[in-house]
Amino acid sequence: MLFLIHCTQKPDGQAIRDAHYDAHRAYLKASPVDIKLAGPTVDDAGEARTGSVFIVDVPDRAAAIAFSDGDPFTANGLFESRTVTRFLDITRGKPAFGPAKD
């Protein structure tokens, strides 16, 4: 099952992110979870990190929460909120509407 995990960073969280970035990356690389998509959310200027998003393929919601709980960012208090939502990939990993037109 696919789950979307959306974590919102605390406004003063950049120091926490910086301090635990290497451990976060190592956790993601070592995780047995099938991570389909992952990355930070950013402000409109694309400069400041505002949170993180993951789409993971796991057996159930409990596994998605356990994956997120094990992330050093979560464990060290970077996030002020988190949502875990079941996700349906209607594109099956392919662009749904063809290539973007300029």
Predicted regions, residues:
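Conserved, structured core segments of small domains
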Residues: M1-D102
